Amino acid sequence: MAGFSKVVATIFLMMLLVFATDMMAEAKICEALSGNFKGLCLSSRDCGNVCRREGFTDGSCIGFRLQCFCTKPCA
């Protein structure tokens, strides 16, 4: 009977671990139009460099109008 209790406890702990990791929330990403990028955004690498100088974590070219949008985790 002691062996059965260990199996049940192990299964319970494994299920708890699966549900706990599933419920963890990812950080939301906020984005804003770059204030310093000039012209058409044709290179997300250039956009990202400008955004990092503005204090963001990254940036990319988005949309039909090819604008540079900066991104960072929301506070």
UniProtKB/Swiss-Prot annotation:
Disulfide cysteine pairs (residue numbers): 30-74, 41-61, 47-68, 51-70
Signal peptide stretch: 1-27
List the Gene3D superfamilies. Knottin, scorpion toxin-like (3.30.30.10)
> What is the reported tissue distribution?
Expressed in orange and red ripe fruit and to a lesser extent in mature, green fruit. Present in trace in young, green fruit.
Record localization: Secreted
Q: Kindly summarize what the UniProt induction comment says about this protein's expression.
A: By wounding.
Alphabetic keyword roster: Antimicrobial, Disulfide bond, Fungicide, Plant defense, Secreted, Signal
Q: Write down the Pfam families for this protein, in alphabetical order.
A: Gamma-thionin
Please report which protein family the annotation says this sequence is part of: Belongs to the DEFL family.
Record text on subunit structure and interactions: Monomer.
Q: What is the protein's name according to its record?
A: Defensin J1-1
Q: Which organism is it from?
A: Capsicum annuum (Capsicum pepper)
| Source taxonomy | Eukaryota, Viridiplantae, Streptophyta, Embryophyta, Tracheophyta
